[in-house]
């Protein structure tokens, strides 16, 4: 006939598995919470975080973009459109710099390709809009983002410099 497995029967009648589960539940119930209350508390961001795009200026106020169009060429989503014209001194500057944020995949290739760190992806990730048209960034919007986030962008680029 069949022998009775006493250890298995003891586990069954003493509800050992249930008590183990209860013990584990109590352990995590009293452990410190890992959840943050997002709108009121924000977690740390990496210096390499890729958020909302921005165009930067030099400290004297001149735009950094030299209209080389490398960012436009390297963009896999074809989200960047640039028009440029030559200036009196022989250099080029952009007349139009548009980014279609509905196409952008935030890969960071534009930032990597830029020889003068003109286009960067800043620390802002809270840029929800009510209309699709607000996601078409023109040069003025990008420059305004750059002015708004310049201190943090410069600090992040400095922290990331050893890895570039």
From Swiss-Prot:
GO terms for cellular component: plasma membrane. It is a peripheral membrane protein. The gene is nuoI. This is NADH-quinone oxidoreductase subunit I. NDH-1 shuttles electrons from NADH, via FMN and iron-sulfur (Fe-S) centers, to quinones in the respiratory chain. The immediate electron acceptor for the enzyme in this species is believed to be ubiquinone. Couples the redox reaction to proton translocation (for every two electrons transferred, four hydrogen ions are translocated across the cytoplasmic membrane), and thus conserves the redox energy in a proton gradient. Belongs to the complex I 23 kDa subunit family. It catalyses: a quinone + NADH + 5 H(+)(in) = a quinol + NAD(+) + 4 H(+)(out). One of its GO terms (molecular function) is quinone binding. Keywords: 4Fe-4S, Cell inner membrane, Cell membrane, Iron, Iron-sulfur, Membrane, Metal-binding, NAD, Quinone, Repeat, Translocase, Ubiquinone. It comes from Ruegeria sp. (strain TM1040) (Silicibacter sp.). [4Fe-4S] cluster 2 binds at residues 75, 104, 107, 110. Its cofactor is [4Fe-4S] cluster. GO terms for biological process: aerobic respiration. NCBIfam families: NuoI, PRK05888.1-4, PRK05888.1-5. [4Fe-4S] cluster 1 binds at residues 65, 68, 71, 114.
